[in-house]
Amino acid sequence: MPTLQLLWMKWRNTKKIADSNKLKTMKERINYSEVAPGALKAMRELEKYVAASGLEHSLYELVKTRASQINGCAYCLDMHTKDARVAGETEQRLYALSAWRETPFYTDRECAALEWTEALTLISENDVADNLYDSVRKHFDEKEMVELTMAIVAINGWNRLAIGFRTVPGTYKPQ
């Protein structure tokens, strides 16, 4: 990851800590599922497509958790770490996810998916270079690339809904 990007991420995280008092009293702005049920239905259809795509469930949960870490979505982090645990994910891998490059805990395929997740989640800050695409493609066929990308699109959409409307974390119960 380029040094400038790391510095920006550190600054952003520091700013979030400084704003934490505001978040402790967080109140939901809009219950979007009640106000616009059609919007929720559209997002759920995308989620159904991705869930049925054939991507490994564990991979999908890692992607959702990593994008939610980057975006700072507390609600989605609460949800997806709970779902990952229920599905058998280890605490070690969940705790190390933000530093996945520094650990031996993830497969090459998972690392490729996490790298693609970071690139697309931070797309306004990065170019999605051909060498990155080629590297990820070694682990995913064309259909899987589309499915992985749709998974990243979906979680980034959910993150923006939850952050924008301040969906309060802590109430999600895995099924």
What are these regions (language model features)?
Residues L6-Q175:
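Hydrophobic alpha-helical segments
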